[in-house]
Amino acid sequence: MGLQGSYLRGEVGPDSDLDVVAVIAKLSMEDLAQYRQVIQSLPHADRSCGFLCGQEELASWNPLEICNLLHATRDYYGCLQELVPAYRREDAVNYCKFSLNALYHELCHSYVHAEEAAMEAVLPGCYKMAFFILQNLHYLQTGYFAESKVELLKRLEGKDKEVLQRHLDQEMPWQLSRDAALLFSWCQEQMCRKSL
């Protein structure tokens, strides 16, 4: 069992989910139903989130996600690293590339096809995704995984810092032309980098 998300990072807000990581020896649909029943009996069940997986399935997980999974999880019972496949630096690089591709596609698709209000509603999630990408890019560049947004912000420069700062400025109203343009140009630059 482990913990992820804002509770792990010390960034709990009024809308924060409680992200629990649970690995079950042999996960079944009955286990899922029982887990759901337990969660629904707890206070604030609507904030339950996280990662639930069978041990054998986790051992076969795509190495692309393992670097992020290990760094974004604090063990509380057992050792997650003993349950996952090995990963290489190339896997972490490909995780960043894949995530950048997905973010870029989301921005382009929403900007063209969504109403302006809907696009502005999508932007906070896009900036949140950028935070996770920045965490991993910073790790690849420095070997240090900054656990919190504030810690990462202190370590960033230039447009990277500008993107994370915008994510942190949740009180500032979202402005489509400004905020979509910043994230779009950041994605372009990151995707077209020759190396990570």
What are these regions (language model features)?
Residues M1-Y7:
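Short gly/ser-rich loop at a beta-strand->alpha-helix junction or flexible surface loop bordering the NTP-binding
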Residues L3, D15-D17:
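Alpha-helical architecture
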Residues L8-P14, A25-L196:
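Catalytic core of pol beta-like nucleotidyltransferases
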Residues D19-V21, A25:
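Non-catalytic interfacial helical region
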